[in-house]
Amino acid sequence: GENDMVSSIDKVLTTIASQDAVPYIIAEIPTNPRVEVPDLQNLKAVLSKQRQTPNGDTAIDPVFILDQTFCPNVHFLGEEDILATVRTISYASGSKFPSGGKCTAGYCVANNKAKALMPNIALHLSLCDNEATAQQYEILAAQLPSMLQRIKDAYVNTREFVTFIKETLPEAKLNFVSEDLVNEG
């Protein structure tokens, strides 16, 4: 797939189907302005595409695991959202926007297609003694109300930096979030 996330995922899922294996795809919402942001409709189509195993059975659909650490305010998993029809688990590290850098505990959620996986995640957290502490829950509860403002401020600062780079180095290849996409939410 070279540097094209969508075609790379398509190739990987086709290979996994040919092996009759269980596909887990982990992706991060990119924050580096030099990293490609995939077309979400094309990503959804590739993740939703039905594939066949070598014996003609329908291949197991992928579980898409999305790291939303840098955009925890964007809804991808609701019934009307872009990934509603793809088995998806989303997580965000609490060390960034959710806690304002005051703790490392984060959170994960699943859409309706992946909710059956959540008890396994809860069991894993329990067995590994990796659940947030009471203090981390308190920090998150105190910090979450101001999270959206921190995200807005970070976007404004980064947008100013990207604009500066584009003006100073017009030949630089930057893939920062477009104004149109920002206006969509």
Regions from the PLM with identified roles:
Residues 165-176:
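Short acidic amphipathic segments
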Residues 174-185:
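Conserved PLP-binding catalytic core of the aspartate aminotransferase-like
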Residues 1-166:
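Conserved PLP-enzyme active-site core in the AAT-like
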